[in-house]
């Protein structure tokens, strides 16, 4: 009888334990269902977790739920528990991560009173992320799964650190946005640009993690797109204008929206994006020439001329008609027709809207300048010289960077380029080259000798004059000190050029300030 009593007691305890676990799982399932339904969904749709924008109340509920469920071996294999756990981790990173937390699970475990082994996480995280939320797992370069990095990237940016570093983060973002277009034209991705700028900043170390850099570059892409799509540079209050035409724009960003500071922070980023884009877009209203060389046509240099929507120029004589024939001429000879256009005339000034945004053609005489010419009744009535349309071919070194299956002219004479895969066309006269390993075989470009150069090099070409060409400038080294101030947004030599006197700051976290003596010449 005693054995029977013990057996029945054991079964009763097992049933009670199973019932308790079942109730815990039901609570997780019910909470998730309510969370998803409140966002107008029947099930997760594969978006990043930060785009669900959990509220403070939901985060508190989720914390209490996981504490109540507690540590249980059976939870490890339950999909809905795993989904709650990974959502909590991502929200914890966004809301509660602080500088001293480090890159570890410990603060998360402390918050909810449970912990897991690496093996258990290998079951829980994929079940929650892939099976429930339909989100991928990130990998290290060694091809091992990066569970913590996955959950932190899904949470967005650590908002407590953002608030702590508010002004510095805005300064970093302004610099990224200020160099955005130039980087794209140089074949430099937003991700690479963000990484280079962040590495040289004084932001907390966590912002240099791959997950943070990717989110910041994605934010830069989004902000730039919003400014261009909604033409925000022409509005004094870009935030108010965007509220009218796209009221849900903030939901695209990895910042908590139920925090007034978060809304204010995003407003500041949008204003910064509008300010940085304005001079760049105004510059884009002018003409621009890009020159390409291809190994398939070694004796030809092709040009892409980008044109604005409209151009204005003085008329040399009163035209007999307002219907102009437009063309691009090289040294007085037409090389590309732009078709007819009607001009508006005022005070001997003609304004013409162009039908084409760009034209492409081969250069006959690259050293000659290009002009946009207007004719009326067969007579030239006005012209505009196109900037940077002359190439001193054979006179100075020409530096091309690789661009898909062709080469883009990046600089003439001395220059510094970000690309680490370049082609240097030497002057026609005998040239001495130093700082070049000479392993790559020279090629023929436009009848001139050209040297393929790879990596971070400092090449000196001596002909009638001495020229210095630096390549691979995206490979930035981080020292103990950095200069902090208003950087020039245009290309300068040296690369680090400031408007006014910059401040010397330390890149080491344990040094708060640096005393320097200012000298004047």
UniProtKB/Swiss-Prot annotation:
<protein>
    <recommendedName>
        <fullName>Protein YjiT</fullName>
    </recommendedName>
</protein>
<dbReference type="InterPro" id="IPR047879">
    <property type="entry name" value="YjiT"/>
</dbReference>
